[in-house]
């Protein structure tokens, strides 16, 4: 293997519960309920596509601009209070670097938000290549973000390992020709859906290091 590619939210960081809480608070402010099923519909999807989905599903009668502003304010509040890295992730990143294997990030999160979180947790330093959601025209499940990462890494899909926690992310990697995709499971995603999308196996964040020791 020549490279390892990580998604960010839900894989490197325990962020999905934070997204859920932020969206729940915003939905509640409109008098609407927010469910885990609805949250799964937008997991791994770029915000520019996810917010209109939420507005329609919640039947929110407001401008997208106002809704987006409220979401950003709530996300900033929640993330500043509760952001933390997933257990075992730093050790996994250190292991990859010790093997002199390239590390890349492929996240649907916009660059400014993503870098703020990576720097807060001191994780940015590990990555050779980073591609963000606002740097591609088509978000996951379109393969564009993974094709761009592969191009910047200058590696072929057969020489890459991917860790993703969303159905759309697994589908994106699969469509880019990558086969060795591990589905990272947590409290807010659906492991069965990850396998159906093409993940070769399911792992918890703290198990990523052991997987890497086997495949690298």
Swiss-Prot record:
One Pfam family hit: HAD_2
Active-site residue list: 7 (nucleophile)
Cofactor requirement: Co(2+); Mg(2+); Mn(2+); Ni(2+)
Family according to the record: Belongs to the HAD-like hydrolase superfamily.
Protein name: Phosphorylated carbohydrates phosphatase TM_1254
InterPro entries attached to this UniProt entry: HAD-like_sf (IPR036412), HAD-SF_hydro_IA (IPR006439), HAD_2 (IPR041492), HAD_sf (IPR023214), PGP-like_dom2 (IPR023198)
NCBIfam families to which the protein is assigned, alphabetical: HAD-SF-IA-v1 (TIGR01549), HAD-SF-IA-v3 (TIGR01509)
